[in-house]
Regions:
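Generic beta-sheet signal
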Residues: 87-89, 164-168, 195, 250-260
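A short, conserved beta-to-alpha structural element at the edge of catalytic cores
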Residues: 190-215, 225-226, 232
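Conserved thiamine diphosphate
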Residues: 161-163, 211-244, 294-301
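Short acidic, glycine/serine/threonine-rich loops at helix termini
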Residues: 101-103, 130, 179-181, 207-211, ...
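Cofactor-binding active-site loop characterized by glycine-rich and histidine/acidic residues
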Residues: 34-189
């Protein structure tokens, strides 16, 4: 399978798995999978230089909080070892956790059995990802925090002479938050060009359409005013997403604004507009419509 087809396969698998879980659980963060599938698939198959997973294929039970717990580990091992020459990945909107778990399964970094542990008591495969959840490394339950934490990581890696890059996956809703802009200003001040952020710009927030809640546009120009290099791409074009990572940005952080559709690939969701943040079925036949869509598109696959 050529690289382009592999990336598209992973993206389709992400949507399929998250749709299946949404049907099984009676709801879920499905629109996030629709908008970000190509972004995460491209990062994991075309862009990031990661080593093989060093974490257990089936995620272990929650081992306790950090501190005196000698066995505590983050979920970073699913993204490979920490090595000077390797990239690192950080997810900021941790309500995308199931989307990330599906990505790890589709790319062979986590066993399919791990998904069966989703949102189970005593497990690490949480609905809202934490630093011990597969693929996660930071506590970012309050949106806007991850980028600030990555500043310290990126600065430390640069001072140690490490050549690996630091990728941050973000949502556009985070740009309604002041901490995000403070982080961007700091990244630019310290000339941290080893940081690349990919933004799922789906125009949605928990409270509705972003431009009706707290406008953030023109986002590209605002980011440039804060000292970043910013590029806009079609967030469902895997070639454009991959090429964006090669944009020259010496001495500056790079932000890839991926313009996306919150129902791409699961078009039956379009009728819910603008209620996309969390798909909770009503009594209007929504679940039955999604079940029919799933059967027609993916058959009996889970």
């Amino acid at each position: 399978m050529n690289p382009l087809d592999e990336t598209r396969r992973v993206a389709d698998g992400i949507r399929r798995r998250v749709t299946a879980f949404t049907l099984k659980n009676g709801g879920g963060y499905l629109s996030q999978a629709c908008s970000s599938a190509e972004i995460l698939a491209t990062l994991y198959t075309r862009v990031m230089k990661l080593g093989p997973s060093v974490a257990p294929p089936v995620p272990p039970p929650f081992g306790g909080v950090p501190g005196k717990n000698p066995n505590y580990a983050t979920g970073a091992g699913y993204n490979g070892p920490h090595a000077p020459e390797l990239d690192r990945f950080f997810i900021s909107p941790v309500h995308y956790a199931l989307v990330l778990y599906a990505t790890l399964v589709e790319t062979g970094r986590m066993a399919e059995e791990g998904l069966a542990m989703f949102n189970q008591d005593g497990g690490t495969v949480e609905m809202i990802g934490a630093e011990h959840s597969p693929g996660h490394e930071l506590m970012a339950g309050s949106l806007g925090q991850a980028l600030s934490q990555v500043i310290g990581i990126a600065l430390g890696r640069r001072r140690k002479g490490e050549t690996g890059r630091n990728f941050v996956f973000m949502s556009d809703g985070e740009f309604m938050i002041g901490q995000t802009w403070e982080a961007m200003e700091t990244l630019s001040f310290y000339e941290l060009d080893n940081v690349i952020a990919y933004v799922d710009a789906n125009g949605q927030s928990a409270d509705g359409k972003i431009d009706e809640v707290m406008g953030i546009e023109p986002l590209k120009e605002r980011l440039e005013a804060f000292g970043a290099v910013a590029v806009e791409v079609d967030g469902h074009d895997v070639e454009a997403l991959a090429a964006a990572a090669e944009t020259p940005h010496e001495g500056k952080p790079l932000v890839v604004i991926a313009r996306t559709n919150p129902y791409c690939g699961v078009e039956v969701l379009a009728e819910r507009a603008p209620r996309f943040h969390y798909i909770r079925f009503t009594g209007s036949g929504e679940k039955e419509a999604l079940e029919r869509f799933y059967a027609e598109k993916w058959g009996g696959r889970k």
